[in-house]
Amino acid sequence: KGEGFSVGGGYNTRNNELGQKSLTTAIVGATMDIGPGTLSGQYATIKDNNPSDLSTIAAGLAANPATAPVATLVQNAFIQGFRQDAHLYQIGYRLTSGPHTVAVAYNNMDDRRPFNADRYSYGAAYTYALSKRTDLNAVVTHLENKNTSQDLLGGNGFLGGVASAPGKDVNSVTLSIRHRF
């Protein structure tokens, strides 16, 4: 961290229960004081061709004569469904003045799997500090699901579930009070 800016990065990889290379993530982010606020940005890659803890599905299904014929198909469907290959881009600006904090942000998830479940969202948040431990919050967020993406917004604009249909856009308005004990 420097005077008016910071830069950071990380890399993580693991093997699944079969010893295959599994989830791998790489991330780089930076902040810079611009004007009265702070600009932040982040880029991440997420890759997982061999998801963890799925290798025993077929064996469990094969034990039952009714499901044995489809055991391998079911396991392969789970593996395909849990694979990840995406690039994530985020940018935001935060301004604090006295008890007031305003933040705006945009993010874009570029899904590189055959599903092509791309999505992007943007939003704004306002926080008013009633005291050092209590604040009021208002958050407005729009999430645009593309193709097969079905993300749903939860509290304060974070992901919170599954939309009712693929490609369905969602909006969120959250009003809250927070007290830290």
Q: Where are each of the predicted segments found?
A:
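Repeated loop/turn-to-beta-strand initiation elements of outer-membrane beta-barrel proteins
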Residues: 4-9, 36-41, 48, 99-104, ...
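Solvent-exposed loop segments that connect transmembrane elements
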Residues: 14-21, 46-86, 109-116, 143-169
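C-terminal hydrophobic structural anchor segments
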Residues: 97-149
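Loop-centered beta-sheet repeat module
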Residues: 1-23
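Residues on the lipid-exposed face of transmembrane beta-strands in outer-membrane beta-barrel proteins
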Residues: 1-2, 28-32, 91-95, 124-128, ...
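Outer-membrane beta-barrel "beta-signal"
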Residues: 165-181
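Acidic, glycine-rich loop-and-beta core segments that form the ion-binding/anion-interacting portion
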Residues: 23-28, 32-37
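Outer membrane beta-barrel
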Residues: 1-6, 32, 142-145
